[in-house]
């Protein structure tokens, strides 16, 4: 097969008329759009949003999946930044209804924006014995996208320090990562540390070593009755920023109680009801949907999730892709621990059921 020759159909995970997931053997291959490339998928990684979106916003025929790695096979005429044959990874956001009916990562082929793709480093580029494989790279798309918006978007935490321009201080500013052992949490901790901040985190005691290995200066048991007080004591009452990777009633309460008296900023990765966010007027909350960095309208049919097109967030992402790519090339980011799912796309369907049941600290990855 040449880079421009494709089969007439593909295998892909889709929803049936009842909203159930199945592997379709004759699914359409997404057409190439301006500014996009088509990738032959090698591996995919599972996220909670993969099963939540198909459960809460079912569409018969919808494709599923966000995180992927693979090889570029087709490039739109207006794209000159990448060539067929390049090994890449990223996030194929399918939150809008029209996009969900045409494209998803849990398939043999996936369509993605060229300006938001990351490249697998070559052996010549790798430093510090970097060994980012296609398998490991599949875990990074959503985590990196979410961290990009959560940490640096002006309406989120709005931090000024970045890995290439860290904040220099004898006493680094603390930032709480609630759920530090999640796939987003472990990446956020590393980016915060590299940006000159003092990342602290909550998680289960069984994950303390993992979270510390990623750069957290202190870790707290999320289930402790006085966890907020412990965080407040540790930070000397000067915690201004909290990234909540769990985003439930308990996590909101802990983050809000730990944030300093003058207030601060709180970012959730799930919708939080207004009555919970109104606990403290001095805290500025924001619900981050990483799909916003595509710069396109998000239409799911529910006000809490629907978003207008936001070119500023797309530009923020594009401006920072190079920085993150250089970090990847230098081996400066450790991927989340993985667990391989056997069975290809059929294994993905089973894996989503298992993920919904909880108890999976490792990132579930399948080779397509």
Swiss-Prot record:
Binding of substrate, residues: 135-142, 290-294
The UniProt record lists the keyword Cell inner membrane: no
Listed GO MF terms: nucleotide binding; oxidoreductase activity, acting on NAD(P)H
Enzyme class: oxidoreductase
Keywords on record: NADP, Nucleotide-binding, Oxidoreductase
EC nos: 1.-.-.-
Pfam family, one: ADH_zinc_N
Domain of life: Eukaryota
Pathways involved: Secondary metabolite biosynthesis
Binding site for NADP(+): 49-52, 204-207, 222, 269-270, 360-361
InterPro entries from the UniProt entry: ADH-like_C, ADH-like_N, GroES-like_sf, NAD(P)-bd_dom_sf, PKS_ER, Trans-enoyl_RdTase-like
Family under the similarity heading: Belongs to the zinc-containing alcohol dehydrogenase family.
Function: Trans-enoyl reductase; part of the gene cluster that mediates the biosynthesis of wortmanamides A and B, reduced long-chain polyketides amidated with a specific omega-amino acid, 5-aminopentanoic acid (5PA). The PKS modules of TwmB are involved in the synthesis of the polyketide backbone, whereas the non-canonical C domain of TwmB is a bonafide condensation domain that specifically selects 5PA and catalyzes amidation to release polyketide chain.
Oligomeric form and interacting partners: Monomer.
Protein name: Trans-enoyl reductase TwmE
Gene label: TwmE
């Amino acid at each position: 097969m040449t880079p421009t020759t494709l089969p007439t159909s593909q295998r892909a995970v889709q929803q049936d008329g009842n909203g159930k997931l199945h592997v379709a053997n004759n699914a359409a291959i997404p057409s190439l759009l301006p500014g996009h490339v088509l990738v032959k998928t090698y591996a995919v990684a599972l996220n909670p949003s993969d099963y939540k979106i198909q459960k809460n916003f079912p569409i018969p025929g919808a494709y599923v999946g966000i995180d992927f790695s693979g090889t570029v096979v087709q490039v739109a005429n207006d794209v000159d930044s990448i060539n067929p044959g390049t090994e890449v990874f990223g996030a194929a956001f399918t939150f809008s209804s029209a996009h969900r009916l045409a494209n998803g990562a849990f398939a043999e082929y996936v369509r993605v924006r060229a300006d938001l793709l990351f490249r697998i480093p070559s052996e010549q580029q790798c430093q510090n014995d970097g060994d980012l494989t296609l398998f490991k790279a599949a875990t990074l798309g959503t985590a990196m996208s979410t961290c990009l918006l959560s940490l640096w978007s002006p309406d989120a935490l709005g931090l000024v320090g970045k890995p290439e321009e860290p904040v220099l201080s004898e006493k680094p500013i603390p930032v709480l990562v609630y759920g530090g052992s999640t796939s987003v949490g472990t990446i956020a901790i590393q980016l915060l540390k590299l940006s000159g901040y003092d990342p602290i985190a909550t998680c289960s005691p069984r994950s303390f070593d993992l979270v510390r290995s990623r750069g957290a200066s202190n870790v707290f048991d999320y289930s402790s009755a006085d966890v907020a007080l412990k965080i407040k004591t540790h930070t000397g009452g000067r915690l201004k920023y909290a990234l909540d990777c769990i985003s439930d009633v308990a996590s909101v309460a802990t983050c809000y109680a730990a944030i300093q008296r003058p207030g601060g900023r709180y970012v959730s990765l799930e919708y939080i009801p207004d009555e919970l966010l109104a606990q403290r007027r001095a805290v500025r909350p924001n619900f981050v949907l990483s799909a916003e960095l595509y710069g396109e309208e998000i239409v799911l049919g529910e006000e809490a999730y629907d978003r207008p097109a936001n070119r500023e967030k797309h530009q923020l992402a594009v401006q920072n892709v190079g920085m993150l790519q250089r970090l990847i090339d230098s081996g400066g980011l450790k991927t989340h621990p993985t667990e391989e799912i056997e069975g290809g796309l059929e294994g993905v369907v089973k894996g989503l059921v298992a993920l919904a049941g909880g108890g999976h600290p490792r990132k579930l990855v399948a080779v397509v």
